[in-house]
Swiss-Prot record:
Keyword Transmembrane: yes
The protein, known as: MICOS complex subunit MIC10
Topological type in the membrane: Single-pass membrane protein
Source taxon at top rank: Eukaryota
Upper taxonomic lineage: Eukaryota, Fungi, Dikarya, Ascomycota, Saccharomycotina
Transmembrane segments: 21-43
InterPro entries according to UniProt: Mic10
Membrane-side (Mitochondrial intermembrane) residue stretches: 44-82
Length: 82
């Protein structure tokens, strides 16, 4: 035996890590949706506003869904496999 104790992470640390991942996912997904909406608006819809709002809505919804999955998981942070 090496005599070293294994210290588990406190639940507060795990919760903070989860919030960091959820908020960063939400910002990234919303930004990607905004960008895709602007791109679609310029190319296909004669610069109307609805594709931008639709893209932002999809981004927020996807970020919320992933955040919900992260908080519902029992094993800490979820690993995404491609």
């Amino acid at each position: 035996m090496s005599g070293q104790l294994e210290v588990s992470a406190p639940s507060r640390s795990i919760l903070n890590d989860k919030w960091d991942v959820v908020l960063s996912n939400l910002v990234v997904k919303t930004g990607l949706g905004f960008g895709a909406g602007v791109f679609a608006s310029v190319l296909f819809f004669k610069r109307r506003a609805f594709p931008v709002w639709l893209g932002v809505g999809f981004g927020l919804g996807r970020g919320y869904a992933e955040g919900d999955a992260i908080f519902r998981s029992h094993a800490g942070l979820r690993a995404v496999r491609a």
